[in-house]
A protein has these predicted regions:
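Canonical Radical SAM [4Fe-4S] cluster-binding loop centered on the CxxxCxxC motif
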Residues: 7-51
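Conserved C-terminal portion of the radical SAM core fold
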Residues: 66-72, 152-211, 224-241
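Structural motif
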Residues: 110, 352-358
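PDZ-domain C-terminal substructure recognizer with occasional recognition of PDZ-binding tails
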Residues: 230-233, 246-247, 288-329
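PDZ/PDZ-like groove recognition
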Residues: 239-269
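Conserved PDZ fold ligand-binding element
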Residues: 262-284
Length: 389
């Protein structure tokens, strides 16, 4: 995997399949919760340092301009670093905007290396959104949790983002089992002064190779979830725990972005979307993207067992402001049900599900769990990672 050809194949595949644009694997932080640490030796990952501008230009040609481009998002086998430590970051962003004038740019950043005085350059590149990995309420927590060498910067950056009206979301990897829940509340309090579109609080996941002091008990998930539910009413921005535990494919709304099309349409947290433009929805993912793709969609939904209807005023391929858990795409649903259907003819078809997903998969495939089908759902312990990441 060290040849130039192999490197380019890996990069181009990531760009083409996920619309992720890797530009660097260099981070300059050393977060105690980093998902790139403590991997089992069998895990295949790639780290490329700063990629050359000419190579990045070629990769940009493979982007789908109808979908957002993600920069700094660790969602593939490539180790993603901090975009704003790349020496050509503004050159890269300007080239993306020149090549694809309408593409939405989404950048995940620690906020440590994006200088507040450079924010006006980002404003000129809109549509652009940032996801700021805040992780703590003050510089001292950033030093402890992230080994941040510039811990003050993000607390100067966020007020500047609000001043320039640049859209941003924020995130926290919760280490409440080490720091207590009060540090989370203090982080929420800071953000309330400069509200993000949403705040995601990630339940930390560690492999069995991590230090024992870091590994978190499963019961802490419910403690964190209850804490967030209790605190939400005090804040103007949605606070969402990740991962979400879901039990069905019902297209339930988790929350809404303030002043969004979804909020203006009268939708609320807990509503279950059933139809969009009179077409049934099959999952949360299906509903979310059908609404995003449509102009002024008519939405049928269920609220406290009552069937209701509304129209959302928005343009095609524009965000609705809905916040929903990610479940299954139509393609995944069709593939899984096709295997279940085939078990009528084939011998002993098995679907292996993790413990958290077992009830969800069992409910989804319930029509096939009878004597007419040779289908079994197996519940499997996660012995490989031992965590949520």
């Amino acid at each position: 995997m060290n040849s130039k050809r192999s490197k380019e194949e890996i990069l181009f595949k990531t760009v083409k399949e996920n619309n992720i644009l890797p530009i660097t694997s260099i981070c300059k932080l050393n977060c105690i919760f980093c998902s790139h640490k403590n991997n089992p030796s069998e895990i295949e990952t790639y780290s490329f340092g700063h990629l050359e501008f000419d190579l990045i230009k070629k990769m940009i040609e493979f982007l789908d301009p109808e979908q957002p481009v993600f920069i700094g998002e660790s969602a593939s086998k490539i180790i993603e670093g901090e975009p704003f430590v790349h020496p050509d970051i503004y050159k890269i962003l300007n080239y993306i905007r020149q090549r694809w004038p309408e593409i939405e740019i989404k950048i995940t950043s620690s906020g440590s290396f994006l200088q507040p005085e450079k924010v006006d350059l980002l404003k000129k590149l809109e549509p652009l959104e940032l996801n700021i990995s805040l992780n703590g309420p003050a510089p001292e927590e950033r030093v402890f949790l992230m080994n941040d060498t510039r811990p003050d910067n993000v607390f100067k950056l966020i007020p500047e983002l609000k001043k320039q009206r640049i859209k941003f979301d924020s995130s926290i990897v919760s280490m409440h089992h080490l720091k207590g829940c009060n540090y989370l509340k203090r982080t929420f309090d800071f953000l309330e002064k400069y509200p993000p579109q949403s705040l995601r609080v990630f339940f930390a996941g560690f492999s069995g190779f991590a230090d024992e002091d870091l590994i978190i008990e499963k019961s802490e998930y419910y403690k964190l979830n209850n804490f967030i539910k209790q605190q939400q009413k005090y804040y103007s921005f949605p606070i969402i725990i990740e991962p979400q535990l879901i039990s069905s494919l019902e297209a339930e709304i988790n929350n809404l972005i303030t002043n969004s099309a979804a909020q203006a349409a009268g939708l609320k947290s807990g509503d279950i979307i059933s139809k969009i433009n009179q077409i049934d929805v099959k999952s949360r993912v299906d509903a979310f993207y059908k609404i995003k793709a449509a102009k002024n969609p008519e939405i049928e939904f269920i609220r406290k067992n009552k069937k209701l209807k509304t129209r959302m005023l928005k343009e095609e391929n524009k965000d609705s402001g809905l916040i929903m858990s990610y479940d299954l795409t139509l393609n995944q649903i069709n593939k899984l049900t096709a295997y279940a259907e085939a078990s009528k003819k084939d011998k002993n078809t098995a679907v292996i599900a993790s413990i958290p997903a077992y009830k969800f998969i069992k409910k989804m495939l319930k029509p096939y769990l009878n004597q007419d089908f040779n289908l079994t759902i197996l519940k499997s312990n996660n012995l490989f990672f031992g965590g949520s990441i």
